Amino acid sequence: MFLSVFDVFKIGVGPSSSHTMGPMSAANRFLELVLSNEWPRPSSNVQVASIKVSLHGSLAHTGIGHGTGRAVILGLMGERPDTVDPDRMDAIIDEVEHSGRITPPGHPGYQFHPKTDLIFDKKVPLPGHANGMSFSAFDKDERLLVKRIYYSVGGGFVVTDTELEQMRADKKKPAAAGERVPFPFASAKQMLDMSERSGLSIAQMKRANEETRMSPEELDAGLDRIWAAMSSCIDRGLKVDGIMPGGLKVRRRARAIHDKLQEEWRSNRINPVLANDWLSVYAMAVNEENAAGGRVVTAPTNGAAGVIPATIRYYQHFHEDWDQEGIHNYLLTAAAVGGIIKHNASISGAEVGCQGEVGSAAAMAAAGLAAVMGATPEQIENAAEIALEHHLGMTCDPIAGLVQVPCIERNALGAVKAVTAASLALKGDGQHFVPLDACIETMRQTGHDMSEKYKETSTGGLAVNVVEC
């Protein structure tokens, strides 16, 4: 099993990887299909005149709060998650709403009225995944020409229904034979076994796998871009205050907290317990930016995007021997763990609840931090397990479908748990009672058994017990 570090960490925009970045990418894919010859045309002069989209399952229930409709419009206008300008998004959407047409580059333009051609269908879920969407293209006489179903499966990943079936079939195959990477581990046990046999660290094995796809220089440059985007997101979040969009009137707090912490900096250096405050404010800064639709990095999702940047910034500020190579090793180790979780369970809140989002992020962060603090592979696996174990059963019940409450503070606590898990693991010898693989399987089973009310539908939990103001 190979999942690139650049599939785990993707630069995009908020507020959600599954409900914003995924639908935008699905719209991109459908545009490419419309221009291709991969669908039967009744005759050579038949042209696409209009497009319609329907959103299903969790996308329908929480799509308005997550900006899913906006993401679809942007994607149909040819905008991509990693390149769209957050400052231009409103203007692009206004243009489509006023004209009733989408005009992506390289296309003739198609009729698309968001109020009638973009449907939030809460009644009929699609069978493959909770985050389903259907794109259809019609000719001028309203005859259906081509239709595709896409699923946003978490972390910005998008697949067709056929690809989803293949992906699930691949999970049932034995791990190694056909994979053209030197270390095709698909489980934590395989990862540890390969590390022991090779004498390499987890980061070194992950690097060797990545370098079958790119040069060492390209890999390092890509890792630098990922951290630069994460770090910039923290910095932006620490400078902005005011009310976040969406109607809940939730106020940004990261800047005010950061200002107070700077005043107390000397005492913070003396009393390491207060490092938790810094961890929290870094994570909150990222997730406040995410909630506002700013530039973020999936880590492994947008809803959990604050945990890993916060712990890397913690590593920079509280460990005098940090260096850029350490950040590279952190990201590679975290991506190795994230890939195992995604392969064997899920990182989607709509599939397994928030244990799959913040829980996975905390496990990845704990593993990365333990690695750069000198942990053995066994201690790294232990750190990831501790962090994930203590997120098991966590629900995804965002109020009003917005990635704000409880999501922003939850990232802060996820970062604190990750650091604690790494510290506990480093105090041991790597031998522990619950294997990471067993914990991941428990998370998968728990998510499967969890009521749909608690899986990003905003129909249970805090979403129905707290009055929206």
Predicted region positions:
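Hydrophobic alpha-helical bundle architecture
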Residues: 322, 333, 339-412, 424-433
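Extended hydrophobic packing segments that form well-structured cores
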Residues: 433-469
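Short, mixed-charge aromatic SLiMs
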Residues: 49-63, 95-102, 330-343, 385-398, ...
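Accessory carbohydrate-recognition regions in carbohydrate-active enzymes
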Residues: 13-60, 128, 159
